[in-house]
Amino acid sequence: MTDQPFGVNLTILPTVRPTPYDEYARAIIEGGVKIIETAGRSPEPFMKRFKANGVKVIHKCVAVRHALKAERIGVDVVSIDGFECAGHPGEQDVGGLVLFPAATQALKIPVVASGGIADGRGLVAALALGCE
């Protein structure tokens, strides 16, 4: 596809039928993907394989407590999704203006702001609140 690094998303959700997440992880590694964004359930079962193969992991979180767990299991970056981002499991209706500074204060790893950023003013606000 390209000789440049690229990323993919792996949403890990509970299902009635088994989902081949192990095969997805293998395809990500064998395909040379260097950045993965995970969402839904914890990426913990895949972290050793991703790390051993040089894959950077960004985990999408809707609460600081989820972000802290993501940091503990070794993700490289957390994407904090304020309520404005919409549609993510575990939402507690907390907006980005509250979540962004709470996450950046609690975490040692980089935090990316997600949701409610529509123009340069929103970007400046996210940066001012400590996001990268």
Positions of the model-derived regions?
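Catalytic alpha/beta core domains of metabolic enzymes, predominantly
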Residues: 94-132
